[in-house]
Amino acid sequence: MRKHFLLKLLAVLLGFTLVATACGDDDSSSDSAADDSAAADDDAEDTVEATQAETDLLDAIQDRGSLNCGVSTVSIGFAVQDSDGIYQGFDSDFCRATAVAILGDAGAIDIIGLTAAERFTAVQTGQVDLLHRNTTFTQSRDSDVGMDFGPTTYFDGQQLMARVSDGFSSSSGVADIDGAVVCTNAGTTTEKNIAEAADLLGITITLNTFEDFDIVSQNFIEGACDVITTDGSGLVGRKAEQQPADQEWVIFPGQPISKEPLGPTYGQNQSRFADAVNWTVYAMLIADEYGVNQANVDDFVGADGELGRLLGGEGEVQSAMGLAPDAFYQVIKQVGSYSDLWDRHLAPLGLTLPGSVNDLWTNGGLMYPPPAR
């Protein structure tokens, strides 16, 4: 009897199990498929992220054989196209110097002109490997935008430019632009800085912004803008190149209204590429510390100590960085030292290096490269 009872109980339980399983299959078949699909999507996203994390940008550039570098299209002295459509300027030559360090050839590069609105997306999407595009290093750009910044190549500051005939002088200040139509680039720290400065001073301005500083400048020339504002170096370039013969433009205030540390910008978490970019800048500054430039660098090959290491001699560190031992010798030989670039592109605009914040620390400036060892 006991055995018969247990067999009946087992049969009942088995029946319940089959019914429950059947009902469960009816209710959850679509959910199960959705779960599988979601899991597959998650796996795909994980795969993309893993692939991106595993892709070493320095290796990719060396395999590709060229560097993609973004610059401004309208920054006089820093990046403008010549009559042959080739970008020339301080920033453009820093792009070339980086190409030399990584690939050994200043011509192994595609220099791409970008607007202020395009520049960060171009890095994030991989259109460019690097920006040398008068881009200010800020907290939000370093964190929220997801960029990494290299050493400052130009310490700048925002200033304003207006016409003397409108009552402005070099001693004018921001308070003197009350009621003025002020024009600048859209989507820049410049736009934010001038709006904030006006608010803090309790003055009223009409702020008009444009995508391209060529348009800003043209509006100023035509009288549609009373004042224009951007980095001081940019205003110096515009004044030198575009001031009409019948007008006198003046830049003010003497003390810039902001800090604008400009330098190379690249995507996050690419430390080997970042090292190559950063040490290209440092090498060009260290060369100046020793009085080495494009014209005389051959005289210093085989030097002892830090300079010898920098130029590829005994104890060099470039090989460990994934670069050629003489990478920085080639940078100086093919492109130049920091002061070579300044003399070539910025001095003709009236920008003075000696004694400025952009001079070496030994001359009272802020340029202080770490030691090459």
PLM feature segments, named:
Residues 20-34:
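Bacterial lipoprotein signal-peptidase II cleavage site
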Residues 68-77, 87-103, 136-137, 156-218, ...:
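Bilobed "Venus flytrap"/periplasmic-binding protein-like clamshell domains
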Residues 51-131, 360, 364:
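Extracytoplasmic small-molecule ligand-binding "clamshell" domains
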Residues 96, 100, 108-176, 233-257, ...:
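Acidic, polar ligand-binding/catalytic clefts
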Residues 30-33, 38-84, 168-181:
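Immediate post-signal peptide segment of exported/extracytoplasmic ligand-binding proteins
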Residues 46-50, 96, 100, 164-168, ...:
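Extended ligand-binding regions for polar small-molecule ligands
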Residues 54-55, 109-121, 169-170, 207-222:
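Short helix-initiation/N-cap motifs at beta->coil->alpha
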Residues 1-20:
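Sec-dependent bacterial lipoprotein signal peptides
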